[in-house]
């Protein structure tokens, strides 16, 4: 039986399950969202916390092809989103792709495939005009200029050593941060200077000892970004809930906590101070299974006004 068939067969059981599991409520209709909607899912996205702080919504590209959004970075008037492709809810790795999206119109303007061994594309960062893509055990880097407009870019790969995991990435002017994802306790965020990364010989492993600094970050960390005041923001989530934490970048102390859309992944600030984010809630390989009957549907790129968060 196909996943859609299984979902249909389970529909009769859902009425009983509703006594225990509440289905996500509908939020904004599809016509209020920029970009191209997928041909699956409900007619409206799910209601989410802090919706009043959201100033723009864009459909994530590649949804129908099975791409699951992970890392995010901002490059001028474009939002870049890294994703992996999967057709099974139990498989969370696959071919990686970076999508470029116009932040004003919501149009997907270009895309670049990332070579093997990329399989999850957990983090995306920009520093010194280079794009860094953090995968579980490998850091990919390539020149950003002309990346989407010419021949396929040449990615340099840097293996990640013990303790350093590319679950998320943070952009700075002359540095990037790589973070670990943990569910059972705090993760860690490591700061690497781009000059030091440039000096690494091909094949040299990047170790925790190479970091200029490191701090602890909360559990379930999916993305992070630094605002103009130098404060660290961390996106935390599962497919059912989301949260934005504001931390002191030196001590790692959590200063504020805000509810956020479920499935929130990569985040980044633009020049205007808006916080851009992307959610994997509603990715096709989850929604084509029985999980689509109970999970929130919010497969969007969205911009937040931090001043409106409550």
Mark where each language-model region is.
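Beta-strand-rich domains and repeat architectures in extracellular enzymes and scaffolds
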Residues: 56-94
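Loop/turn-rich, solvent-exposed surfaces of beta-rich toroidal or solenoidal domains
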Residues: 211-249
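Residue-level detector of Asp-centered blade-edge/turn motifs that repeat once per structural unit
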Residues: 74-76, 126-128, 171-173, 226-229, ...
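Beta-propeller blade signature
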Residues: 94-104, 189-197, 244-249, 290-310
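Conserved beta-propeller blade signature
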Residues: 79-81, 130-133, 140, 175-179, ...
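Repeated scaffold domains used in trafficking and secretory/extracellular systems
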Residues: 66-71, 118-123, 160-171, 218-223, ...
């Amino acid at each position: 039986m196909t996943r859609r068939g299984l979902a249909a067969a389970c529909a009769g059981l859902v009425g009983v399950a509703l006594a225990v599991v509440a289905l996500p409520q509908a939020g904004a209709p599809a016509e209020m969202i920029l970009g191209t909607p997928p041909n699956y899912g409900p007619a409206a996205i799910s209601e989410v916390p802090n919706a009043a702080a959201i100033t723009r919504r864009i459909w994530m590209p590649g949804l129908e092809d099975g791409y699951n959004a992970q890392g995010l970075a901002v490059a001028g008037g474009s939002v870049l989103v890294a994703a992996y492709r999967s057709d099974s809810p139990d498989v969370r790795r696959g071919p990686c792709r970076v999508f470029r999206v116009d932040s004003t119109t919501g149009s997907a303007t270009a895309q670049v495939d990332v070579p093997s061994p990329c399989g999850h594309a957990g983090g995306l960062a920009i520093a010194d005009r280079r794009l860094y893509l953090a995968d579980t055990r490998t850091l990919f880097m390539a020149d950003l200029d002309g990346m989407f407009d010419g021949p396929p870019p040449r990615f340099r790969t840097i293996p990640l050593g013990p303790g350093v995991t590319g679950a998320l990435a943070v952009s700075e002017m002359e540095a990037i941060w790589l973070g670990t994802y943990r569910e059972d306790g705090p993760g860690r965020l490591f700061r690497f200077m781009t000059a030091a990364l440039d000096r690494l010989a091909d094949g040299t492993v990047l170790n925790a000892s190479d970091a200029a600094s490191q701090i602890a970050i909360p559990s379930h960390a999916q993305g992070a970004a630094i605002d103009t005041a130098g404060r660290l923001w961390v996106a935390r989530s599962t497919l059912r809930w989301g949260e934005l934490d504001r931390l002191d970048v030196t001590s790692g102390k959590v200063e504020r906590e805000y509810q956020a859309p479920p499935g929130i992944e990569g985040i980044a600030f633009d020049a205007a101070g808006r916080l851009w984010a992307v959610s994997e809630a509603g990715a096709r390989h989850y929604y084509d299974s029985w999980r689509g009957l109970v999970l929130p549907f919010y497969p969007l790129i969205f911009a937040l006004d931090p001043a409106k968060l409550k």
